[in-house]
């Protein structure tokens, strides 16, 4: 039986919403873009997504969008007030499990809390994707942020119980010179990995790598089992 694809709704199809949609689609998720402005409603620019021309601040729009079937809803408009309304409606009226909201004005950051239905509040497209996949990232390599003006990336992989990496030593991974495991997070503890450290299910491994391999990382991790993907990527 085919694995169910995560359904993600995005309110706001401007540059930010489109960028997030493309990355989530590349990662194998099902995406619906909701846009109320005619000039931004351009299905041809993200053809693999579903589109809805409507105002996501309206309950009727979220009903039409099937918000109750969304695993995640992202409020990605350029208006903080709209993002707060979308987040509150998604959580309180439709019970969306995870709501990610874009903060446009830093002075409004204090409002973006669970009181408004917001699980994760972020300000950049990359952080939005990480916020979305934070709830569904087991077995997936997730890019957290760019480093050194985009020349390198910080990414994480959470090991599921059935992953062949479980029980292996860090030293046996054979990572190349341009990729390093910098931290292991286990049970709330931060561990500096050593060659003899044995990996356990649930471990969060943080990697720093050359940004030029990001697309290869994503294609490999999301298109194959993690152990095979890491072998293909890192050559071990």
Language model: regions and residue ranges:
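Cytosolic regulatory regions of ion transport systems
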Residues: 1-236
